[in-house]
Amino acid sequence: MNIQTTNRLTSAETALIEAYNDQMGDLPGDGEVFAVRDRLLDELKTAGLPTRRVEAWHYTDFKNLLRLVPSDIGKGLAEALPATVEGSPVIAVLQGKASDKASVKNLTVARYADSLINGAAAVGLEALGKDDAIGRINASFVRDGYVIDFPDGTELDAPLEVQFIHAGGQIHSRLPVTFGADVKATFIERHQAVQGAAALVSSVSEIKIGKGSEITWIVLQEQGSEDTHLGQLRIDLGEDAKLKLFVINAGGKLVRQELYIKVAGEGADLTLRGINLLGGDTHTDVTMVLGHDVPNTGSTEVIRNVVFDRARGVFQGMIRVAPDAQKTDAKMACNTLLMSDDAEFSVKPELEIFADDVQCGHGATVADIDGNHLYYLMARGIPEKKARAMLVNAFVAEIVEELEDEALVEALEGVISAWLEKHA
């Protein structure tokens, strides 16, 4: 089915429709999958990309900000990178394609393309409502990824890293991961560009965490300076499940990272920590929708942002507490350092509480470096530039140091330090 339109579209919207018409013969999927693909792109064509008039996209005018849509998957060569933590297992999606030979001891690992071909992926491709532009784009174009299952009782002695590496073009991947009961594991989801043309990247991770499991999940995004990165995490926490989620954005020209989290099991707990490093004329938007659906659950969210030059950042955090979710304890904070007069950051915290026996709160700060702290360091002979760098590094490193794996802390601090050295 060729997508036709008579509506007035932007060049990016037109390019998406033309790319789908050009690529559909090569995309994997059975009839049911293509019925979903066609319908979702048709909806995107009819409604267009979101503008500021759409509440969820008010601070990110996606329709006008999205300029670059490569026509195909790109011809660049991408290779797997060394593990973030030396010696840890790595499986990679290179230029949008997963490996037939990927395997991890004691886990079930399959290519997502196989789920598209046999139709098993059709249900999961659905968008999360009328404003889910990322879900629609990804479902329309997704080619591959991994489906990973952790059996009950699995304990990993090193982080498992899934790398999404590209060298330009259109790259659309999917990562459904199911953790059974009583699993203990650390998972690294790493997105990175190597030298090559600019890219439009979309990635959807579907994470289900079973009863009593304790999971640390790290998203490390280091796309190229001209890349668009559209990331989405769909997370479901079961009974007594514990999730520590760390999201680090340190790249990309236009970034939208969405977190849809359901605390669906009694006794479940979420710890979310985010670091957003912005420079140049980039735009990064982190949007979270967190639902506490049952009694006796908890969550804490702390987001740290550093904004240089003419960059623009956004954090939208919505916490919804259902009527039956008594004894919910939810706290959210967003703290931002603006490092230039032209830098901007918008914060929109929201609470929707329908239960009466809860403890919920939120707070936000947007400021320059504390003058007293800067004076203290300079009074001891430290040059101003170095003193500023030390304070910025300490501001974000505090988040990373909450991780228990010292090798992982060291690796992530290295990423942060390298970014700050380049941009500060």
Locate predicted features.
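Conserved beta-strand/loop scaffold segments within soluble protein domains that form the structured core
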Residues: 2-5, 124-382, 396-424
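Short, low-to-moderate order helix/coil transition modules at the start of elongated helical scaffolds
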Residues: 1-214, 220
